[in-house]
Amino acid sequence: MRSPLPLSRITRALSLPLLLTLGLATSACGDGEDCAVGTEQFRTELFFGLDRENDVPVSEADWQNFVDTSVTPRFKDGLTMFDANGQYLMDNGTLVHENSKVIVLLHDGSAAHSQDIDTIREEYKSRFHQEAVLRVDSTSCVAF
């Protein structure tokens, strides 16, 4: 039996649901066709694990401070946040559950926005001592 690839915890926990979500989003209007309703925009989902090495999870206050200082200034037009629960299987066979936060951003797909998103990811990893922040990009038809 092959050993699993050394992926980060959050990647393992969310791979299948994210692939399914990505496939559904792409089939909605990501095939190069014009949107029947609304306009095509880029959609980025960011998955932030809340567990830390010292067993003290990222608090709601710390999370909101991060959003207020790192995310909102870069995406002033708005964003969506929600709580999520993931799980992943460690190499030793132990099933681990982890609470997380998800941010959904709609944007124009510019290099500047992509860099802003990568900066947000790096700031979170640095501030909260995380291995990774999962990023999923797709296109969606958006109407307000």
Model-derived regions, located:
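C-terminal motif of bacterial Sec signal peptides marking the signal peptidase cleavage site
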Residues: 24-28
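Short glycine/proline-enriched loop/turn "hinge" motifs that connect secondary-structure elements
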Residues: 35-39, 94-96
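Mature extracytoplasmic domains of secretory-pathway proteins
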Residues: 62-100, 105-112
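Helix-rich interaction surfaces within compact, conserved domain-sized segments
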Residues: 95-144
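Bacterial signal peptide processing site
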Residues: 30-32
